[in-house]
Amino acid sequence: MNKLMTLTALALAATTAQAADIYVSLETGKNKNEGTKEAPLKNLWKALENAKDGDTIHLAEGIYPGKMKQNWFLIDKAVSILGGYSKDFAERKPLEHKTMFQALNENNDKKGAGLGVFTIDFTKQAKQPDGVDMKFDGLIFDEGFANSYHETKGKPEGFDTGMWLEGPAMNKTRDKFPSANRYLVYSATANRATGKLSFTNCAFVNSGNIAFNVTWYQGDVVVENCVFCNNRMIGANVMCSKAIPQDGPNKPRAGWKPEVNWLFKNNTVLFTWSRLNDLADMGFGVRNNTGVNATIADNVIGLNVLTGYDNTKGAGAMKKQSIDGNVFFLNRESDIQMTVSPSIAKVRVDGFEDLEGTDGIESIEDNEDLKDPAAFKDRINAKYLNSFLSMKYSESTKLDEGKCNGLRSVLGLPLQGTITTQCDMFCNRYPLEDALKLFGAISGKGAQAIK
């Protein structure tokens, strides 16, 4: 027994010795330093190159641009990254000592191969890691100055930008390049790592693509106490890459359980925009997918263009979810949309009681509408909110007034002309400082103040 205990202790000691703390300070560091508190590295990309599985990287305040200002970071090792330190690492306050990833449009030509600002990709490793415990905490992602926005179209009074533009369209007056159109956090679909991936106390703002787009093979994904504000298509999306054993189409084998458990708790998800400025599809605050067991609890999910929570991806028998204790408000079409074959049901929070046991929903309790709008006073950008609530989309035909169309009209034939579309706003840049005010807006619900 004593020999076994000794061997166990030695193994634990070896594991501890292998895990290192690496310190990075953009202002005071140098890439030739050792990466200690006293001699930090200068750049995160350098720390990621030096790191080994199990290491923790500590980031001081600053705007980290990536190697050659590419503004993406390859995370191909099972590391943790903690931000929010003062430049001398004397204290850690993420909303005071901001560790930021805030690219500039002028560098979009350097964006390289990274699909996300953080691209988690283990596929080049000889063996992908098992049993990881990767933690990302106190980080701020903002693509508001990497995007390109129209100079005048879709620009409400008092806004500093017009509507978001998808490349190749761009604002040639202000910008050098089209929008970067990348994820903020991306995990490769071919990843086969197992274990736990956590993002806590982070902010995801102004993404021109899905903000948090993570595929995991087996284990846990945790997203807790984060703010998602003004992102395009989906705020948070988690998928499972492990194949599901089936006894028939959409019939998992008896005893099967989802391989990925996703905890999405105490997050605030506001202003998720549609794919295009016609406001026709996407615009989901949160989406669950096949092979995932999602726990959606105590979040504030509101002001999303299509729906707060999308449950239409994959058959209900192939996924599970509990949706409890959330605040849903002013999502434009519905608070939840789900598959009720062969249709899509769009349901408001006051109709949730009928959903339990449907489409993989195991529990849906204690959800409510926003009781006190005053909770967002001085925390939400009032101009942005008012413009969003007043937003209109119109489509009209400017007809040819010639005799040809006159005759077509008499005969009941289709008229010919040009279609013009107009939307009051679309994914305009949201001020980062206002997005960060959303931490702590409602006690117990949504993102809480970071301690």
At which residue positions do the language-model features occur?
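The right-handed parallel beta-helix/beta-solenoid scaffold, focusing on the short coil/turn
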Residues: 20, 55, 71, 77-79, ...
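Right-handed parallel beta-helix/beta-solenoid
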Residues: 18-46, 63, 450-451
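Hydrophobic h-region of N-terminal signal peptides that target proteins for export
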Residues: 10-18
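Right-handed parallel beta-helix
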Residues: 83, 130-145, 160-174, 192-208, ...
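Acidic, glycine- and Ser/Thr-rich low-complexity intrinsically disordered tracts
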Residues: 90-108, 168, 316-451
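Short glycine/acidic-rich loop motifs that flank beta-strands on beta-rich extracellular proteins
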Residues: 68-70, 91, 105-106, 111-115, ...
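N-terminal extracellular ligand-recognition/capping segment immediately after the signal peptide
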Residues: 45-48, 53-91
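Right-handed parallel beta-helix/beta-spiral solenoid domain characteristic of secreted/periplasmic
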Residues: 79-162, 166-174
